[in-house]
Amino acid sequence: MTHTEDEHKFRQGRMASFFKREDPTYDRWERTCQPKSALGKGAYLALYFLPGLLAAIVINVPAVFSTELRITHLSPRYLQFGWLLIITLGWHLLSPFIFLRLLDGLTIRESLSYLGLDRIDLKGIFAVLPVFCFAFALVSVPYIQFVWTPLSTFLQAVPLFHVPPWSIFGGDPAGLYAFPPYALAVLFVGNFVGEELYYRGYLMKKTSFLGRANWFVNPLLFALYHLWQIPFTWPLIGLVFAFGLLMWLRKDLYVLIAFHFFVNM
């Protein structure tokens, strides 16, 4: 092996060590809390879709939505806001702790460790994440123009994927961002923290039976779960793989929460 080849391998190793982080605690929970049966594996895959299916039914189905309005006497906007809080702060944040206790027998402290809430990757946040976000921005700008725009237009023309006119997710930013700042702050916590806790902190370990495909399948199912706003989220599938890749590289929940915040801003 020549000196040049040695130097090239050394540089590759340094670059890999910069981006890739090992976490024995992450690996241990990934091994010990795996579903054993085919039914169990299917159930965890189904858990990717259930929150989105619920949101699509209670927001997008006219008969269901009108019934909710009559019962609650809420405005359409605040009824949807209430459902978002239930799903993001309730389902996403609480269900992992409930499932880990009932199905895996973990204590609160063990659940915090499983989810990655008890440790933080400072190098990932302050060194790796800025580089990753810069690369993501370089890819996303042309992607939005040349891929997202035509795909979104196509999906909006499909009746099955139609977003109803009362939806705050109809593509107009004013629909969602017209809420008071304090309400948006609560919602954003549920969004950034809740979705990452549920999809990366909890489910990504549970579906590690997928092997090397796990980092790819996890963000794919995460994108598809947005059933209540298909024309605007499904076209982003080409970009969301960055979430699974970053979790595979750093194995840290807080890095993903920060990245989610960057992407949504």
Which residues does each PLM region occupy?
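Short helix-kink/termination motifs in transmembrane helices of multi-pass secondary transporters
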Residues: 53, 57, 137, 141, ...
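Membrane-interfacial segments
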Residues: 63-70, 102-111, 146-151, 155, ...
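Structural signal for membrane-spanning alpha-helices in multi-pass inner-membrane proteins
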Residues: 95-104, 139-140, 222, 226, ...
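Transmembrane helix-loop-helix hairpins at the membrane interface
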Residues: 7-10, 14, 162-265
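N-terminal, membrane-interfacial amphipathic/helix-forming hydrophobic leader that caps
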Residues: 1-124
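Residue-level signature of transmembrane alpha-helical entry/exit and packing/kink sites
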Residues: 40-48, 77-88, 124-129, 179-184, ...
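Juxtamembrane helix-loop-helix connectors linking adjacent transmembrane helices
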Residues: 68-79, 109-191
